């Protein structure tokens, strides 16, 4: 798996104090495959998203689950109310592409592109008045 970088961006880049963020850089999965899973959890409550990721049979779900658990721990460390958290943003950006040549028939070679992703998950507390019943 890639390296997990935790950045406290509460004072810059438009992030607010009631948000928590975790970024996994250089994840060994194609951004297209990661986006399929991340689209499913965006906007959901944290508990629902964890359950959903546990039952999705994809590699991207395992990676996203680890990042989600990390961002939940960041929110807990920040003192946010875990019951009011929802996933505000879940994106997979393009990382670098590892290129290697594979020998083929008749003296040819073709390039294989191993795509890497940067996965970002942002949690935010729901406002007091907008509690779901």
UniProtKB/Swiss-Prot annotation:
Belongs to the universal ribosomal protein uL22 family. PROSITE patterns: RIBOSOMAL_L22. This protein binds specifically to 23S rRNA; its binding is stimulated by other ribosomal proteins, e.g. L4, L17, and L20. It is important during the early stages of 50S assembly. It makes multiple contacts with different domains of the 23S rRNA in the assembled 50S subunit and ribosome. The globular domain of the protein is located near the polypeptide exit tunnel on the outside of the subunit, while an extended beta-hairpin is found that lines the wall of the exit tunnel in the center of the 70S ribosome. Pfam families: Ribosomal_L22 (PF00237). Part of the 50S ribosomal subunit. GO terms for molecular function: rRNA binding; structural constituent of ribosome. The keyword RNA-binding applies. It comes from the Bacteria. Keywords: Ribonucleoprotein, Ribosomal protein, RNA-binding, rRNA-binding. This is Large ribosomal subunit protein uL22. GO terms for biological process: translation. One of its GO terms (cellular component) is cytosolic large ribosomal subunit.
């Amino acid at each position: 798996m890639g390296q997990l970088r935790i950045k406290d961006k509460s004072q810059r880049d438009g992030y607010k104090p009631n948000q928590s963020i975790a970024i996994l850089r250089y994840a060994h999965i194609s951004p297209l495959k990661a986006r399929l899973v991340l689209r499913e959890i965006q906007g959901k409550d944290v508990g629902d998203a964890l359950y959903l990721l546990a039952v999705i049979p994809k590699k991207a779900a395992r990676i996203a689950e680890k990042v989600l658990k990390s961002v939940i721990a960041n929110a807990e460390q920040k003192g946010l109310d875990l019951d009011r958290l929802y996933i505000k943003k879940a994106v997979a950006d393009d990382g670098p592409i590892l290129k290697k040549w594979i020998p083929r028939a008749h003296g040819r070679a073709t390039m294989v592109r191993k795509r890497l992703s940067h996965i970002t998950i942002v949690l935010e507390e729901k406002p007091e008045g907008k509690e779901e019943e």
